Amino acid sequence: MNLTELKNTPVSELITLGENMGLENLARMRKQDIIFAILKQHAKSGEDIFGDGVLEILQDGFGFLRSADSSYLAGPDDIYVSPSQIRRFNLRTGDTISGKIRPPKEGERYFALLKVNEVNFDKPENARNKILFENLTPLHANSRLRMERGNGSTEDLTARVLDLASPIGRGQRGLIVAPPKAGKTMLLQNIAQSIAYNHPDCVLMVLLIDERPEEVTEMQRLVKGEVVASTFDEPASRHVQVAEMVIEKAKRLVEHKKDVIILLDSITRLARAYNTVVPASGKVLTGGVDANALHRPKRFFGAARNVEEGGSLTIIATALIDTGSKMDEVIYEEFKGTGNMELHLSRKIAEKRVFPAIDYNRSGTRKEELLTTQEELQKMWILRKIIHPMGEIDAMEFLINKLAMTKTNDDFFEMMKRS
């Protein structure tokens, strides 16, 4: 029996399964407690139980395997990992571990890990001699992540504008600068769907911080990938813990030469959470930001890199501006020069209900010549020269109308050449 499979089973089926095993009063219990009771009953019959999760090591030296389904929140069905196992396999926070588990003995509260079968989807022996993330060599992004799907749909228009305005590569550190109601969540969903469609080999993680619960549900249903969220009714410490778990997991996967993509909504809210959590240093910047508060969100954002030894970590984060809060302006100013790709959304364009509301002239990618062919780069530059004198709304309307006539960007450039 597998713990993860039970977590994905609907509650009604779990109750039926439990009643068939002779358990009572399940209807009044929480889902995690029902799973706990079923597994305890199952283990009494002497059969094996398997479980997996992402390791979080606590200060006392032991750790727990947390589940991504509950957004790495501590719960009764977490799996205890002993300090000796952590030392033996050289495990770190963020390692994805699967193995055989046993039910709690008398006086214990958690399931315990008996045997490690896999570390980060690899044999445990291979995990011992990997290079630490901090020691890997960072490079410019040089392998393109294409967003265009080529199916001619209206969603694909957004992806195509994105490919023209600011191409994204593996290892990009991108910032989407957005005022409220400019369609940033829709844009992120679009990017997520394009990545799942065009690059199924990449590990996609969507991290929603301080978000509305209904948007979390929508994202989980639309995105083929891991959606980890902490809603606005949870404390700041919880936002911070979720973000730390996601970035640590991503780093461990990059050490195993995987390409990981994190879509973060939003870095402003994450920085606000760190500002609440961090101990007061006595120095306060404009807008009430503590002088030490922005170091950790910068470490999160700065982890994005293309790695020479193989693998990459791409982070596309949204930053909020024009919210009327001085703190948000300060946070944006701090992150402004750190990314190597910027996409600006415009409130004016969105108010006219023209989507995607991208401010084409202000958006762009550094070192874009590494991501595109020389011929494509020339065409993109010519397009910029045509669009530059127009106003931001006219530019976007012109581009969308022209793109709608063709199915792919190559066709669009051909049409441009002829005219």
Curated annotation (Swiss-Prot):
Binding site for ATP: 169-174, 181-186, 212
RNA-binding among keywords: yes
Gene Ontology MF terms in the entry: ATP binding; ATP hydrolysis activity; ATP-dependent activity, acting on RNA; helicase activity; identical protein binding; RNA binding
Enzyme class: hydrolase
Pfam family, one: Rho_RNA_bind
UniProt-annotated stretches for the region RNA-binding 2: 284-288
Keyword Aminoacyl-tRNA synthetase included in the entry's annotation: no
Gene Ontology CC terms, in alphabetical order: cytosol; membrane
Domain (Rho RNA-BD): residue spans on this chain: 48-123
Site keyed RNA-binding 2: positions: 326
Region (RNA-binding 1): 61-66, 78-80, 108-110
Family: Belongs to the Rho family.
HAMAP family registered for this protein in UniProt: Rho (MF_01884)
Assembly mode: Homohexamer. The homohexamer assembles into an open ring structure.
NCBIfam families: PRK09376.1 (NF006886), rho (TIGR00767)
Job description of the protein: Facilitates transcription termination by a mechanism that involves Rho binding to the nascent RNA, activation of Rho's RNA-dependent ATPase activity, and release of the mRNA from the DNA template. RNA-dependent NTPase which utilizes all four ribonucleoside triphosphates as substrates.
Protein name: Transcription termination factor Rho
Origin species: Escherichia coli (strain K12)
Lineage of the species this protein comes from: Bacteria, Pseudomonadati, Pseudomonadota, Gammaproteobacteria, Enterobacterales
